[in-house]
A protein has these predicted regions:
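Non-ligating segments of multi-cofactor redox enzymes
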Residues: 1-257, 263-302
Length: 302
């Protein structure tokens, strides 16, 4: 059944913001580089971080897994391609979208924007947009970089180059502010991506994590492992009173009592804090995250 962490679940969900801040700092340890306008190019850049964090960020401690994968997906002669693929699969199997909820810098950035006091809009009627991120993953991360390669077999990072707003936020903006030569070289591509960043910022104020829900290919990849990952959500049906408070609290539009490990669940723990009977918690173990469902279904059928 796996090991349950009821007390730890409450603590983790309560201090999630601090965990996100710590993860962002660890992902970007080289803060003085923001003033220097240079990049860290040490051994750490050969290691992929779990969340969406631009390689070109002056403070970046490691490589972005999506960017690294796009560069080498088109050729099996790069051993690095096997490493990146293996790391992504391992992270997915171990944590699933827990990474989105706790360890991703850009996810945290969107959440901070959403805290700005203004009218908030629901995304419940926009659920079909969820599938866009899978198209982005398939086309811009897998297919185009795999088939459109240069003479040495390296693909163009289409997602990073044409769509990723994190690259502008962490890379282009700070580097251009510190380097006049880079400022002079900015062109229409920067304008396009800066417009995307502005759109994400505005939407993040109104909607909860719109980029994560609709466009992020890394979230789409981890979502594929949500139902089979080692770290999961668990619902104790004997404790659940079907009050619906967990579903109402979920900003990812998931009903944890129906699908504890839905692909959209980022394991943020909002449902854990909302549950009046402590029926929801984190667990480590493989399975569907439900307990005593047979007994309940039998009783309900009487």
């Amino acid at each position: 059944m796996g090991k349950k962490f009821s007390g730890v679940s409450q603590t983790m969900s309560r201090f999630r913001g601090w965990i996100q801040a710590g993860a962002t700092l660890l992902t970007n340890l080289h803060l003085p580089n923001f003033l220097k306008g240079g990049l860290y190019q040490g051994a750490g850049k050969t290691v992929c971080v779990p969340g969406l964090n631009c390689y070109s960020c002056p403070a970046a401690s490691g490589a972005c897994p999506i960017g690294a994968f796009q560069a080498v997906v088109g050729s099996s002669k790069f051993s690095f391609s096997y490493y990146v693929t293996g790391v992504l699969i391992l992270l997915g199997v171990l944590l699933g979208r827990f990474i989105c909820g706790f360890l991703c810098p850009f996810g945290w950035f969107q959440e901070l924007l959403h805290k700005i006091p203004t009218k908030k809009l629901s995304t419940r009627k926009l659920k079909p947009l969820r599938y866009l991120k899978y198209a982005v993953l398939l086309v811009m991360v897998f297919l185009l970089p795999a088939f459109l390669v240069n003479d040495v077999g390296m693909g163009d990072p289409f997602f990073c180059k044409y769509l990723c707003p994190q690259g502008v936020l962490e890379g282009a903006i700070p580097l251009s502010l510190a380097n006049s030569g880079i400022r002079a070289a900015l062109g229409s591509l920067f304008t396009w991506k800066f417009s995307i960043l502005l759109a994400v910022i505005v939407l993040s104020v109104l909607f909860y994590r719109p980029f994560c829900k609709w466009l992020c290919p890394l979230g789409a990849f981890y979502a594929l492992f949500n139902k089979v990952s080692l770290f999961q959500m668990k619902v104790d049906k004997n404790k659940c009173v079907s009050c619906g408070k967990c579903a109402k609290a979920c900003k990812m539009d998931v009903d944890v009592t129906k699908t504890p490990n839905h692909p959209e669940c980022i394991r943020c723990g909002m449902c854990i804090r909302a549950c009046p009977t402590n029926a929801v918690c984190f667990r480590c173990g493989f399975g569907n995250g439900k307990e005593n469902t047979t007994k309940i279904n039998t009783e309900e059928s009487k």
